[in-house]
């Protein structure tokens, strides 16, 4: 008997996933292939007690801009500037989408950029391999900020996110072997501390609306984890498995919506999964690309879900079959997000701690 994981692993992306038609500034897509992908989304053997009810997004994904990323990641919405920032890790750059005009600006970076975070003074925190830097999009200046402990060769930062008090959590990884040599760090002001070692691919860093729950994934362990989180001290509680995925799909980047549900981009599985706080799968959104990487809510009312994607290591046939691989996508999923937390240059803002 062929399992659902084998079915998806052997999926033939030999035909376009969505039929494309042009509208001003975007490409929209019909979704006839969704019916074919839905069985995989519905039957992959997750350790869940509930029935999974896949449902498509309220509107099909739309391409934003014409750029193609090798490994798009770390989307963050800046509500002050009404723009979305994200990175291309492999072709090192920070990108900015102007929501009003639709224009995309690109700033090349000097080294692999794992992730970014908003800063309370309007700049961006940038996780480079041997330096956590500050980037100012107003004048394109890049300033050294914190030098982490020396990383072994071929190591880099990957996913990162600020907690509700303004600490920056970021994980490192081996860029080639993905061996369990990575470290999860927490940055408070200019003080960087190692919290956890033995990480393969750090991902899915996110926090519940009240900041009392922290989420994290080590992608190659095919699990999403949750922790009680003390915002006053920045200390994680005991680890518990929120949900597990089945190869070939593994958890990549996440965001939390205003209802407290976790949206996770499942790399290699062509889908976004919305998890309830108890780990129950609430919704599955089929994507037109095999490798969604991360997601973030944006727009004037935080009603648009932006999704970064990857085109790396794809054959010519795969690229032809998935013309949106590497694109920034936008869709309406019927819920709103939360404002992105900003890094506090002067240290954690403890007055921002909220009770459940």
Where on the chain are the PLM-derived regions?
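Short loop/turn segments immediately following beta-strands, especially the blade-tip
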Residues: 227-234, 333-337
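A short loop-to-beta-strand structural motif that recurs across blades of beta-propeller domains
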Residues: 93-95, 131, 183-185, 223-225, ...
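Hydrophobic alpha-helical segments and helix pairs
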Residues: 141-195
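Blade-level signature of beta-propeller repeat domains, shared across WD40, Kelch, NHL, RCC1
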Residues: 300-356
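A short beta-strand motif characteristic of beta-propeller blades
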Residues: 60-65, 102-108, 143-150, 191-197, ...
